[in-house]
From Swiss-Prot:
It comes from Pseudomonas phage 201phi2-1 (Pseudomonas chlororaphis phage 201phi2-1). Induction: Expressed by 1 hour post-infection (at protein level). Changing residue 303 to A: 60% loss of ability to form filaments. Keywords: GTP-binding, Host cytoplasm, Hydrolase, Nucleotide-binding. It is found in: Host cytoplasm. The record marks 187, 190 as: GTP hydrolysis. Consists of two domains: a nucleotide-binding N-terminus that hydrolyzes GTP and a C-terminus domain necessary for polymerization. The domains are bridged by a long, central helix. Interactions between the C-terminus and the following monomer drive polymerization. The lineage of its organism: Viruses, Duplodnaviria, Heunggongvirae, Uroviricota, Caudoviricetes. This is Phage tubulin-like protein.
Amino acid sequence: MPVKVCLIFAGGTGMNVATKLVDLGEAVHCFDTCDKNVVDVHRSVNVTLTKGTRGAGGNRKVILPLVRPQIPALMDTIPEADFYIVCYSLGGGSGSVLGPLITGQLADRKASFVSFVVGAMESTDNLGNDIDTMKTLEAIAVNKHLPIVVNYVPNTQGRSYESINDEIAEKIRKVVLLVNQNHGRLDVHDVANWVRFTDKHNYLIPQVCELHIETTRKDAENVPEAISQLSLYLDPSKEVAFGTPIYRKVGIMKVDDLDVTDDQIHFVINSVGVVEIMKTITDSKLEMTRQQSKFTQRNPIIDADDNVDEDGMVV
């Protein structure tokens, strides 16, 4: 029998978020290219490091050929599950490669999954990785004929990394609640059809899509052009249909479920949200590049008449 849910964390960001969810124990699987992000609390979860790597240094091109051949072995450590949650940074070097490669393998398994991704906004280098990783996910969606559903959290400047990790962990717990198979009127196939909506509606073009997680009907209604919608209610009398989704299902949470913290939660998937994500990333990179173009290029301090030998020594 497959387990209900498996959580996969890749790269430094994934490893950090995993520290907030170690209480989930055996359900948590962490992957990285070096041991520098491994801390004591990771001992209670599954951690696998790639062989022959010492980190990526933010360079996706360098790490890709080193880890790609190892993906089948990594996947062998991941159990069969009814639902998978993947978490990584778009802008790093390790997670932005491991995450999409694992995602592609999950698609081949015909698995149901969503990803939580962090947009790294710290530098033009990170932003370039953000763009390339999003394009990678779009290519995977097309190649695998499956929507790749992501919840995107931008790492905006001035915000602490810890607060971002907390936000992602809280959202992940809501998805874990969604797929715990403890809700009335909601079965495993309802969840699968929600996230893999092109299986049933194959006229829709598989693309990267955005997952919105809202705890009020008003906020859920404000998600534009909702494609697929799944709602949980604690009180069934509060259920009200809204929007114009192609797919909609409802689950009724149980009062005695200790994981329930909200009286309603809405999980809404759309495609147009990705347009705004890409615009934000691209505009941020252009603005940062514009500011960098103003940097002063100083004159060299070596004079033409300096005696410089073949080792660069000035004597």
